């Protein structure tokens, strides 16, 4: 067991030692109980029971009917948790969740208050890489209670020491050691203190290149500028970024903090015709999210009672809920942090509804004592656009407007980050491929496949445009470009070892992996 360091090491050991499926499942449930009592994201859990330990199990039928763990948080809410130790590539089907959903909707008696209770949050933990069947996904949609699914990725990215946890330890002694700020982050922290505290400015811009640790720097700035009575608002443009920030801040914090996630699928992933039918979802956040104002206010009160900073992490799309909560409570935000702040630019047109992304600038809408805008790519507008907006009596939010965004107190450019050794140097290779350059076999296969599938499924198929781009990627990776006379590989003969491809939408990411190896073979055959 001394060599066990990762969750995968633990799972392999459990599978090897278990003589039955029941034994494997029981060991995994015990591990997950310790995990929930250790991972910083679940600090608000006061108790976690194995099913056989739960006092209210008799009211729910007594026997194991899908609920493996029960947790109680510091607001008095109960969580139903199912734990599945499946193979990494397994798919969660509807049968795996049906009994859990059915039994977690039943009532039970709270043995402390002697009141009838229901579960408020539903958590499904599995050791798969998010392999959920369509029917299982549909069964978890539209539920009245928050449903959260935790997969292998979340377990792998947890800040716990899996070796210690597997040995039976839990709590702070089973956590990994935290991060320490690097020189450029310390400089940014010092500049922030000077700008906001010493000079007394209420707005300011932090510009840092991608990959240099903006999120961690913002955490340390927040901890220096606020105390245990403070209320902080952190805004992001997507659920995925909210999840990343939640994980990073709860893992790296050096002082007590309570995170409240505010977002919903309906608000953060509004679908337009022609867009993907599959997107990031609140069910993939590590902790339950809410858009219920009463729930938000209740959590704020608990944090105040426990003398913890309250950090509301919200998408810009759910800013209306945050505004309602602040006004109902009569509270000010001590520090509002706007991540990806370039998204908050744009024109506020007179007599039209304002974008959720620009509402954050208003003190009336979001009462905040200080605002920190951070981005790697500040967005500015040309003078002609500014003049036109002024002529139309519109308000233009441009990041060079210090009345809205404040002064820039720290900048770390991509160039400086590369020179400092913080980022790897890079080159830009522009790949130009025409549809005429597609090999005949490739174009014919795409054409036949497109004719064979249903019209509604065409978006999920690899089309000519995607195939052309894919050929461009193959050219760049292989350096075997037709017609260049071998100049590309001569200039840069070192083989490509790894590549990451970014797609504008999700559907091509599903089609491309299956198509790339086939198209590569067809391409080089010709």
Language-model regions: role of each:
Residues 383-525:
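Interdomain helical connector at the RecA1-RecA2 junction of SF1/SF2 helicase-like NTPases
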Residues 230-254, 259-272, 318, 505-507, ...:
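Conserved Walker A/P-loop ATP-binding site and its immediately adjacent core
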Residues 275-310:
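Conserved motor-coupling elements within RecA-like helicase/translocase cores
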Residues 209-211, 342-343, 362-389, 421:
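Conserved helicase ATPase motor motifs in RecA-like P-loop NTPase domains
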Residues 3-19, 23, 35, 41-42, ...:
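ATP-dependent helicase/translocase motor core
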Residues 296-332:
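Conserved helix/coil segment N-terminal to the catalytic DExD/H
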Residues 62, 70-81:
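Active-site beta-strand-loop-beta-strand hairpin of nuclease catalytic cores
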Residues 328-373:
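SF2 helicase catalytic motif II
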